[in-house]
Structures are given as C-alpha cells and as structure tokens.
Amino acid sequence: GRGIGPAYEDKYGRRGVRVGDLRHPEITAKLVTAGVERANAMLGLQGASATCEAKTILAMLSALAPRLLPFIGDAGRIVSDTLKAGGNVLLEGAQGALLDVDHGTYPFVTSSSTTAGGAATGAGIGPTAIHAVLGIVKAYTTRVGNGPLPTEAEAPYEEQLRQLGGEFGATTGRPRRCGWFDPMVVRYSVRVNGLTALAVTKLDVLDSFAELPICTGYRLNGQLLDDLPDADAAGGGRLAPTVRDRDLAAARVVPR
C-alpha cells in the first residue's frame, strides 16, 4: 500500500508529522523518533525482521524541507479572500462517494471524507461558501478492490467495458471491476453530496453493446429496495440487483 491508512491513524491519534512541523526541526525530530519506535514495535509483533531508523527519515525530511516550506500557507484564508474579492474557486475532490469513510460502503472505504462536505473541511471554508456541486459519474459502474458492486458484469462483458473504457489504475495499472449503470448508487450520491448538477461521462464506451442491463432496484434477503441500504441495514447480506435490458437501437437514432 501507499501508507494512507497508517497516515490517517497518526493524524487522528494526534501524533502525525504535519508539513508545518518542518519549520521546527526539534518538534519534527521528536515526532519522528516516537513514530519510528511505534512502527518498529508493530513490525516486531508481525514477525518482520525489517526496521526503520529515525535518522534516515529525518535526513530525508531535512532535504525536502527547503522545497516544501515556501508553499506552506493558510489555504482557508486564501480561498476565503479570493471569494470575497469576487473570484471563482474550483474545489476538485478525489475518489467516489461510496469510498467516504462515513457515508460509503464501510468497511470497504478510504480514510477520509470524499463527499462534497469534505471539500469545505479540506479547504478550510464554511459549507455556505460552496454555491454549486457538480457530480461526475460514468455511464457504467467501476470499483477498485474488494467491496460490494451489485451490478458487476459477467466476465466477457466486464472485460469489454474495462478495455473500451481504459479501466486500469492510473498509478498501479490494476484492473478495475466493471458493472452496469446503477441508478441507486447515483441517487444516493446525489443525496449525500447535495449535487446541483450531474455530468455523465464515457457514454461512448456503451456504443458496442446491443442491449444494456439497467438496475431498477435491489433485493436484500427477499425484500425489494429502491434505495441503497447502509452497511448496518444490509447486515452482511448480499444485494441482488433487479435489472431490465434496454435496447439501444432507438437511442442511436438522432431526431431531425
């Protein structure tokens, strides 16, 4: 992994090294030394022979500090001042709504808030400063790694979606799981993000399919649902999609 989870553990444990700490070498040294001691203890419990050295990490941070320090600033004040001056600010979030640590498909989530509310927190501004929220959604569904994907396509169709859509991890090249369009997920995302507009991408990927299975609801333990249940309500049960096939022939005819 890339250490994202452990970094958040340190943050919420109030023991992480922040970029601003690089201005104070004595504070950085204290935090790094304590962190290395914890890491080595955990490695030992796992039976690993490898260990970390504080001096190595401190040397690396010392070399990075001159390059990073000029960019330290109060992001919230910068954004707020820009808005007060009549400027426009675009906040771009990462990852999908269902990876949100609070509102996603827990425990198959990331460590941060990936919904629109997290943009205000991350930028250091109040939620009323955000006047429009644009949601970006593909014309089909993808997921990286484990976790629920109710509309996951069968192998040949999944591979077709993956190849046509270029669904491979940007960093690792890891193939993404692919499925059909899921309006239940989109509806949920609209609600938890407070979307004011929606942009649907990669419609052309579906051109080669004669029919498209579209999810119209879920079945969970025999009960028909028209919305995405939370993890507690699902209780570990498997969501089964109810699907209708849509013929694309008529959709390809452009009215004159």
Can you name each region flagged by the protein language model?
Residues 1-256:
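Non-transmembrane, aqueous-exposed alpha-helical and coiled segments at domain scale
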